[in-house]
Design a protein with these regions (language model features):
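Conserved N-terminal entry element of GNAT/NAT acetyltransferase domains
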Residues: 2-56
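Short amphipathic alpha-helix that is part of the acyltransferase structural core
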Residues: 44-79
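Acetyl-CoA-dependent GNAT
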Residues: 74-121
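A conserved beta-turn-beta hairpin within the catalytic core of GNAT-like acetyltransferases
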Residues: 115-124, 133, 185
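A short, internal acetyl-CoA/4′-phosphopantetheine-binding micro-motif in the GNAT/acyltransferase core
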Residues: 125-135, 160-161
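Conserved acetyl-CoA-binding loop-helix of GNAT-fold acetyltransferases
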Residues: 134-149, 169, 173
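Conserved active-site alpha-helix within GNAT-family acetyltransferase domains
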Residues: 139, 162-181
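Conserved GNAT acetyl-CoA-binding A-motif
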Residues: 149-161
């Protein structure tokens, strides 16, 4: 229900979505800010560093998304990919977004996020750069999102299409999951279990 309502607001009533997003960001920071400020990842994946998206130049994020092939967005459209949308997400305290940066060349290898809500739920998503696919980074990013989400006390969820084989396998291999509901278009609404 909440998932469907969020998509209606985001897609049809964007002005109301933006207002709710700002309020949620403030309330989330009040409830979880202290825990987040004290949070450190246990370890970085070998060869990569985890960097909060808010610490990455907006233009670099826009460039990352623009370099991905069109098919990468078939199942991935959680937000806008223009500078204004990215900047707004970087300022949103409830949008826990991270990038994996390749230590050898400084390139962004992947992007992941928990879109979090002050009432204690988070919805995770991720994108692996076209040149880094097949290296297990989707699974790695799921583990990163689980680590931060569970550490601060969120219940985590995700929607994944059974047609998006790589993402589906990544969700299964990184996490204990429970299928909450089968959605139209071969999508699954999953709860990620600790």
């Amino acid at each position: 229900m909440l998932y469907a309502l969020a998509h209606i607001l985001r897609d049809k009533l964007s002005w109301l979505w933006l207002l709710i997003e700002k309020l949620n960001s403030c309330l989330f920071d009040i409830r979880y800010g202290k825990k987040l400020r004290g949070f450190l990842f246990k370890e970085n994946p070998e060869g990569y560093e985890i960097i909060p998206m808010r610490d990455i130049p907006t233009e670099e994020m826009v460039s990352f998304f623009s370099q991905q092939p069109e098919e990468a967005f078939t199942f991935f459209h959680p937000h806008g990919f223009d500078a204004k949308s990215i900047k707004r997400l970087q300022q949103n305290r409830s949008f826990l977004a991270y990038i994996l940066r390749d230590k050898t060349n400084g390139k962004i290898a992947g992007y992941c996020f928990n879109r979090s809500f002050f009432h204690g739920q988070g919805f995770r998503g991720r994108m692996v750069d076209i040149n880094y696919r097949g290296k297990g980074l989707g699974t790695t990013m799921n583990k990163i999102l689980n680590e931060v989400g569970f550490a601060i006390g969120l219940r985590l969820f995700e929607t994944v299409s059974k047609d998006n084989v790589a993402s589906y396998k990544s969700a299964l291999s990184a996490s204990n999951i429970k299928v909450v509901k089968e959605l139209p278009d071969n999508d699954l609404y999953l709860e990620i279990l600790p």
